[in-house]
C-alpha cells in the first residue's frame, strides 16, 4: 500500500513538472535577464519595493544602479498615475463606489540593443461608506498597496515578451543585411553599342 502511494505521488510530480506547470505568481524570466539593474526615481517607493520583491521571487539578482557593469539589462520604472472615477452613486447623489485605475510605465534597456517600453494597468473598485471614514481610508490604502503588487506582477510577466522581441529584431536585422541582392547595373536601351 505504501509503495502504491509513493508511486502515485511520484507520478503526479512527474506529470505536473513535465507539462510546464509552475507555481502561481512566478514567471519564467529569460536567462539573459536573471541579473538586472533596477533603476527608479524613488528607490524606496511602493512601486520600487513591489517590483524588487517580484524580481527576487522570480530568481532575478539585482545589481546596484551605480555598478560598473554595462552588459546587464536595466529595468527603469517610470511614471505612476492613480485615477479615481465614480462608478455608482447613492440615491442622494453621493458617490457610493469608485473605480480606481493605476497606470505604470517602465522600460527595459538591453545594452547594445534597444529600449523596450512596457506598461501595466490595474483596475479595482472601492466602496465609499460615508459612515466609516477611518475604515474607508484604511481600505483604500490596502487596495492601493495591492494595486502596486499587481502592477509589479504585470511588469515582470512582460519580460519574456521583451526577450522575444529582442530576438525577433535580431533576426530581422540579419535577414535585411544578408537577403537583399545587389541591383544590377542599368543598361541604356536608347544608346547604341
UniProtKB/Swiss-Prot annotation:
Recorded topology in the membrane: Lipid-anchor
Compositional bias (Low complexity): 174-186
Pfam families hit by this protein: LptE (PF04390)
Main location: membrane
UniProt-listed InterPro entries: LPS_assembly_LptE (IPR007485)
Cellular component per GO, a single term: transporter complex
Subunit structure: Component of the lipopolysaccharide transport and assembly complex. Interacts with LptD.
Family as reported in the entry's similarity comment: Belongs to the LptE lipoprotein family.
Protein name as annotated: LPS-assembly lipoprotein LptE
Lineage: Bacteria, Pseudomonadati, Pseudomonadota, Gammaproteobacteria, Enterobacterales
Gene: lptE
Amino acid at each position: 500500500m505504501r509503495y502504491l502511494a509513493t508511486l502515485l505521488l511520484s507520478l503526479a510530480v512527474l506529470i505536473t513538472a513535465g507539462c510546464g506547470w509552475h507555481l502561481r505568481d512566478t514567471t519564467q524570466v529569460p536567462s539573459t535577464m536573471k541579473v538586472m539593474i533596477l533603476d527608479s526615481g524613488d528607490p524606496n517607493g511602493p512601486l520600487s519595493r513591489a517590483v524588487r520583491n517580484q524580481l527576487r521571487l522570480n530568481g532575478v539578482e539585482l545589481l546596484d544602479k551605480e555598478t560598473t557593469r554595462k552588459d546587464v539589462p536595466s529595468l527603469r520604472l517610470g511614471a505612476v498615475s492613480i485615477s479615481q472615477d465614480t462608478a455608482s452613486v447613492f440615491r442622494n447623489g453621493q458617490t457610493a463606489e469608485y473605480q480606481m485605475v493605476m497606470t505604470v510605465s517602465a522600460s527595459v534597456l538591453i545594452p547594445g540593443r534597444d529600449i523596450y517600453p512596457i506598461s501595466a494597468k490595474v483596475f479595482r473598485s472601492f466602496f465609499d461608506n460615508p459612515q466609516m471614514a477611518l475604515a474607508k481610508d484604511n481600505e483604500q490604502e490596502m487596495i492601493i498597496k495591492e494595486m502596486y503588487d499587481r502592477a509589479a506582477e504585470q511588469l515582470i510577466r512582460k519580460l519574456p515578451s521583451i526577450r522575444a522581441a529582442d530576438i525577433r529584431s535580431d533576426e530581422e536585422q540579419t535577414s535585411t543585411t544578408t537577403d537583399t541582392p545587389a541591383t544590377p547595373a542599368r543598361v541604356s536601351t536608347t544608346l547604341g553599342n
